[in-house]
Curated annotation (Swiss-Prot):
Keywords: Membrane, Mitochondrion, Mitochondrion outer membrane, Transmembrane, Transmembrane beta strand. The lineage of its organism: Eukaryota, Fungi, Dikarya, Ascomycota, Pezizomycotina. GO terms for biological process: establishment of mitochondrion localization; mitochondrial genome maintenance; mitochondrial outer membrane translocase complex assembly; mitochondrion-endoplasmic reticulum membrane tethering; phospholipid transport; protein insertion into mitochondrial outer membrane. Component of the ERMES/MDM complex, which serves as a molecular tether to connect the endoplasmic reticulum and mitochondria. Components of this complex are involved in the control of mitochondrial shape and protein biogenesis and may function in phospholipid exchange. mdm10 is involved in the late assembly steps of the general translocase of the mitochondrial outer membrane (TOM complex). Functions in the tom40-specific route of the assembly of outer membrane beta-barrel proteins, including the association of tom40 with the receptor tom22 and small TOM proteins. The keyword tRNA-binding does not apply. This is Mitochondrial distribution and morphology protein 10. It is found in: Mitochondrion outer membrane. It is a multi-pass membrane protein. Belongs to the MDM10 family. The gene is mdmB. It comes from the Eukaryota. Transmembrane segments: none annotated.
Length: 471
C-alpha cells in the first residue's frame, strides 16, 4: 500500500497533468504491482494529515523487536483541493496499486501559457479577490518539496525537490543523507540524484546524474502510432499501444556500464468498451461484428532484455474481471542457464451498502400495490434500473504471489472502519541461504523442522501488520 506522502505526490502529478506512466521506468509497472509487492514484517502505525491544500504531514512508528519511526513534511505550490485525504474517503485502488490500465498518450497543454496553466490549477475557487500578491513567484511554476527524517540513529534524511519547468519538462532532485553512529566523528554521508524528464506524449526522455560514483544515465520511451500532438479529424480511438524503450548508465569513476531495452504491448480502454452507434456504423467495412468489443479483457505484454548480463524477462498480465487480475513472469539467463518463473493474482472484494429494512407487512400490502397501479398513468415514465456499482465500494484486496521455489507471499489490504490496514505473511524456503549451505547445515539424520521443512531453513519470512489513519 502506498504511503500517504507517495499518494500526495501522485495527486500532485495528476493535478499538473504529468503522465507518470509514459516513462521507461514504468514499462513493467503492471507486473511489478502484481508480482513484486512487499509485505509488512512488523507492526507499524502511520498518522497523516493534509492540514491545508498546500501542506501535509505524516508520522510513522514501528515496533516489535526494534522501535523506530519517521517524520515527514510536504509542501506543494499547487493546491490539492479535490484530493481526498481522509482514510475513510481515499479510494482503495489509489493506494493498493494493482493492474494498471495503460492510457493512450496525451499531448502536453501548450495552447495557453504554461505558467498560467500550472499556476492557476485549483486557484480559481480558493484564491480570494484582491489578494493577487498572496501567490509567490515560486507558485508560478508547480513545485513540490518533501522531507522525511528517519529515527533513531543512524539518522537518515531524505529530501525531494520537484518542479515543472515547462509543460513538457520536469526537474527532480533527491537527496539522501545518513548520519553515522553517535560515537563516530565521520561526516554524514550524502548523495544527490538529479533527473530531468522530457515528455511530449509521443516519446519521453529522462536524463539522470548521481553523485554516487558520478553515475550518468539516460532512459527513453517511444510510442508507436499516431502523434497526439497532431490529432486527425474523425479518427477512430486507438485500441492498442506498442511502446519501445531503452536505458543506459555509465560511471567514469568505477567504469560501470549498464543498459537494457524493452517492449510493451497493451490494450487501451477503447478496446474493451462497447462502440457507440456512430462509430459502429463507420466501422462496418472493417469488421462484421461491430456490436462487440475488440477484446474481452485488458492485457499487457512486456519483453525486457539486458545484453550485458544476458538476462531475458517476459511478463503477461491480464484483468479477467473488474475484481480479478492475473500476472506471470518468466526470466532466463543465456549465460548461466538459470531461469525464474513467478505467478500472482489479486482479488478485490466489494461491500454492498445495506439496503433499508423492509416495511412491516400487515397483510394488506398487496391491496396497496393494486391501488397504486390503478392510479398510475398508462404511459408513466419507467425508472431506469438501479445499478449496484454506486451501492458498492471496494472494501479489500487479497494478493498472492508464488515462484518456482515455492516462496509464497500473501497480502491483505483493506479498510476497517476509518483505518487502512495491511497484513502480510511470507512462506517458503529461505532465499538468503544457498542450497549448498542448507545441505551442509542439515543434520545427518535429515530431521524435519516444526514447520515441515528442512531444519536450518526458515519457512516463515515475516509476518507484519501496518495500520494507517489520515485526516
Amino acid at each position: 500500500m502506498l504511503d500517504f506522502m507517495d499518494y500526495i505526490q501522485l495527486a500532485f502529478a495528476e493535478a499538473t497533468n504529468w503522465n507518470r506512466d509514459n516513462s521507461y521506468s514504468s514499462l513493467t509497472a503492471t507486473a511489478q504491482s502484481l508480482l513484486d509487492f512487499s509485505t509488512p514484517e512488523r507492526l507499524r502505525v502511520h498518522l497523516s494529515s493534509l492540514a491545508t491544500p498546500h501542506f501535509a504531514t505524516s508520522y510513522t512508528l514501528g515496533t516489535v523487536g526494534l522501535i523506530d519511526g519517521s517524520v515527514s513534511y510536504l509542501y506543494s505550490t499547487v493546491p490539492l483541493n479535490n484530493t481526498p485525504s481522509r482514510s475513510a474517503l481515499i479510494p482503495l485502488r489509489k493506494l493498493a496499486r494493482g493492474y494498471r490500465q495503460v492510457q493512450p498518450p496525451v499531448a502536453p497543454v501548450e495552447d495557453c501559457g504554461w505558467q498560467s496553466c500550472l499556476g492557476g490549477l485549483g486557484s480559481s475557487e480558493s484564491k480570494p479577490s484582491g489578494n493577487d500578491d498572496s501567490q509567490p513567484s515560486l507558485g508560478r511554476k508547480a513545485t513540490l518539496l518533501n522531507a522525511t527524517l528517519h529515527l533513531p540513529p543512524p539518522t537518515i534524511l531524505n529530501a525531494l525537490f520537484l518542479r515543472r519547468m515547462s509543460p513538457t519538462m520536469q526537474l527532480s532532485l533527491a537527496v539522501c543523507s545518513t548520519r553515522g553512529a553517535p560515537l563516530s566523528n565521520s561526516a554524514p554521508q550524502a548523495s544527490l540524484l538529479g533527473q530531468l524528464s522530457h515528455d511530449t506524449g509521443k516519446y519521453s526522455n529522462e536524463y539522470l546524474f548521481s553523485t554516487d560514483n558520478s553515475l550518468f544515465g539516460w532512459r527513453g520511451l517511444w510510442n508507436f502510432g499516431p502523434d497526439p500532438r497532431h490529432p486527425k479529424e474523425n479518427s477512430s480511438p486507438q485500441l492498442s499501444l506498442l511502446s519501445a524503450g531503452a536505458e543506459a548508465y555509465y560511471s567514469p569513476v568505477s567504469s560501470l556500464i549498464g543498459m537494457s531495452t524493452g517492449l510493451r504491448f497493451s490494450t487501451l480502454p477503447a478496446a474493451t468498451e462497447m462502440p457507440s452507434s456512430s462509430s459502429s456504423a463507420s466501422s462496418t467495412t472493417t469488421t462484421s461484428n461491430h456490436g462487440t468489443p475488440i477484446s474481452t479483457f485488458p492485457y499487457t505484454l512486456t519483453l525486457v532484455l539486458t545484453p550485458l548480463t544476458g538476462s531475458l524477462s517476459t511478463t503477461y498480465s491480464l484483468r479477467a474481471s473488474p475484481n480479478l487480475a492475473f500476472s506471470s513472469r518468466f526470466g532466463f539467463n543465456v549465460y548461466s542457464w538459470e531461469s525464474e518463473m513467478v505467478a500472482g493474482c489479486e482479488l478485490w472484494r466489494k461491500r454492498r451498502k445495506p439496503s433499508p429494512p423492509p416495511v412491516d407487512d400487515d397483510g394488506l400490502e398487496w391491496a396497496r400495490r393494486k391501488m397504486r397501479m390503478a392510479d398510475t398513468p398508462a404511459f408513466a415514465p419507467v425508472e431506469p434500473p438501479t445499478t449496484h456499482n454506486r451501492d458498492e465500494e471496494n472494501e479489500s484486496v487479497l494478493k498472492i504471489r508464488v515462484d518456482q521455489s515455492w516462496n509464497v507471499r500473501l497480502l491483505w489490504e483493506g479498510r476497517v472502519k476509518e483505518l487502512l490496514v495491511s497484513a502480510g505473511v511470507g512462506l517458503g524456503p529461505s532465499s538468503f541461504s544457498s542450497p549448498s549451505r542448507a545441505a551442509n547445515s542439515t543434520p545427518a539424520g535429515g530431521g524435519q523442522s516444526v514447520g515441515g521443512g528442512i531444519s536450518g531453513r526458515s519457512y516463515w519470512h515475516g509476518v507484519g501488520v501496518s495500520i494507517s489513519y489520515s485526516s
